[in-house]
Amino acid sequence: NDEPVKQYMMPPIELLNLPNNTNSSDYEREQKLNERKLIDTLNSFGVSTRLVGVSRGPSVTRYEIQPAAGVKISKITNLADDIALNLAASGVRIEAPIPNKAAVGIEVPNKSRQSVTLREVIDQSSYKNAKSKLTVALGKDITGEFVYSDLVKMPHLLIAGTTGSGK
C-alpha cells in the first residue's frame, strides 16, 4: 500500500453552536439583590461581615464575605439553612475559609443557569495553544474561568456508560 498518510484536519469550529446571549442586567440585578439579602440575613443573626468579592459561574455565584474580628466561622456555617431560606435558594454551600483567602465563600445557585457550549470552551487561546495533543475541555469553574486537563496526567481516569453509547 503506497498511499501517503493524510494529515488529519479538525472540522471547522463554525459547525458548533454559539453560546446563547444572556441578559447581563438580569444577572446584575439578581446579584445585587442577593448581596443585600445575604448581609442583612447575617446581620439579623448578629454576625457582622462585609462583602469583599463576588464570583459568578455558569450555575453558582460565590459571595466572598469577611467576618468582623471575633466572629466565629462556625456561626456562619451553622446559618446555611437560614441563608438559603432568606435568599429563596434550594440550598447554599459554605466554604470556610476559601483556600488562600481571608474570606468565607457562600455559594448560591443562580436562578437561571448559563449554558456552557463546547464551542466557547475550545475557541479559547489557552485550549488552542495547549502543549499536549490530549488536552480535554472540561467546561467552566465557579469563577467563570475555562477548565482544561491533560489526559496524559490522568492514568486512572474512568469513563463509564452503557454499551454502544459512544464512550
Predicted regions and their residues:
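Primarily NTPase-proximal linker/entry elements flanking Walker-type ATP/GTP-binding cores
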Residues: 1-156, 160-165
